[in-house]
Amino acid sequence: VASNLADIAAMGAKPTVLVIAMVVPKTTKISWLEAFADGLQAACDQLSPGAAIVGGDLASGDQVVISVTVHGQLEGLNPVLRSGAKVGDVVAVCGPLGKAACGLALLQSGNQDLIRSYDDWVKAQLKPSPPIDQGVAANQAGATAMLDVSDGLVRDLGRIAKASSVTLEIDRSQLSGYEAMLDLPAQSLGVDTLSWVLQGGEDHSLLATFPASATLPRSFKIIGKVVAKAAHDVLLDGQPVADAGWDSIAGN
């Protein structure tokens, strides 16, 4: 639910209704289905109050398959696409960077002591909480391009850059706050915090570009700028940066 709601928010819209299609084995207990439905609605109530599940489809099969479709309202605004970034715009983020990747690393470590100690980071992976209401706020503030960070900051920056025929340059010093939030678990796991910030996905934070003259919503933090198209889509302090984010098609 969270990732689908974030997709609507990233268009600058307000999520309104959800349609759920499910395939479940014939042995599935009604109590499980009821609990699952309650969980879906609880997620809506928490992340996007007013959004409701209005229908869907249910079929039987060998394994559980779930498809979620979210519809939204632009409330008179234009949709914010990936293709509108302009040279001179600022690049800004609303929400954490690298926190979900940190949680995944903790889970993959299998170290139960660490998993318990850093429960907040683990929850970021298992139960993300994107800033859904800030999508409309960004649209109202004049966002020129936007998406949610689902596959890694660098990869998603690159998507805006390609769609807009520009290059996005990030200021490393503006990432220090995100890195600081990851310091303790990173030390425990022996991981470089910057790799999580740049390449970790599934935070579903909002990544947007705005005119330099725009008054950004308070929740957005400027991390860089849009420059003329160069040989590389994304730069970090003027240097090319490796893209090692998630590829949904390749599955890696």
Listing of model-derived features with the role each one plays in the protein:
Residues 26-52, 59-66, 71, 140-141, ...:
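Glycine-/charge-enriched secondary-structure boundary and capping motifs
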Residues 76-81, 114, 167-169:
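Phosphate-handling active-site elements
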Residues 110-128, 183:
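A short, charged helix-loop
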Residues 89-95, 127-153:
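Internal active-site segments that recognize and position negatively charged phosphoryl groups
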Residues 83, 94-96, 123-127, 146-149, ...:
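Glycine- and other small-residue-rich loops at beta-strand/loop junctions that grip anionic moieties
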Residues 14-108:
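Glycine-rich anion-binding loops of enzyme active sites
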Residues 1-11:
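Active-site cofactor/substrate anionic-group-binding motifs, chiefly glycine-
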Residues 73-74, 114-121, 188-191:
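Glycine/charged-rich beta-loop-alpha catalytic/anionic-binding loops adjacent to active sites
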